Amino acid sequence: MAQAFVNSKIQPGKVVVFIKPTCPYCRKTQELLSQLPFKQGLLEFVDITAAGNISEIQDYLQQLTGARTVPRVFIGQECIGGCTDLVNMHERGELLTRLKQMGALQ
């Protein structure tokens, strides 16, 4: 069930972030991404605490990405890591370039 749930969220052309609402790194990730002009429907924050099987979801994220911590940021079907990875990518200018290339920004 956790595998199907996670896989149903990860889609080409979309940015998906798996979060826990109380996590400060998740909030920082949400703040950064929410400032960008995404096209409607191409940015999704998935609260794994609402799914009810948090530990199973994190176990599957570990299997899929090598880490079970949140946030887990997917650009298209590729996991780019967590908050620090996203911030570093943004500071290097790579985030905007990548999002423009995939057509996610207005």
UniProtKB/Swiss-Prot annotation:
| Functional summary from the UniProt entry | Has a glutathione-disulfide oxidoreductase activity in the presence of NADPH and glutathione reductase. Reduces low molecular weight disulfides and proteins.
| The entry's keywords | Acetylation, Cytoplasm, Disulfide bond, Electron transport, Redox-active center, Transport
Q: Which GO terms describe its molecular function?
A: glutathione disulfide oxidoreductase activity
User: Between which residues do disulfide bridges form?
Assistant: 23-26, 79-83
What is the name of the protein in this document?
A: Glutaredoxin-1
Q: Which Pfam families match?
A: Glutaredoxin
Give the UniProt family note.
Belongs to the glutaredoxin family.
Q: Which sequence positions carry the modification called N6-succinyllysine?
A: 9
Q: Which GO terms describe its cellular component?
A: cytoplasm
Question: What are the Glutaredoxin domain coordinates in residue numbering?
Answer: 3-106
Q: Which residues carry this modification: N-acetylalanine?
A: 2
State the superkingdom.
Answer: Eukaryota
Compartments where located: Cytoplasm
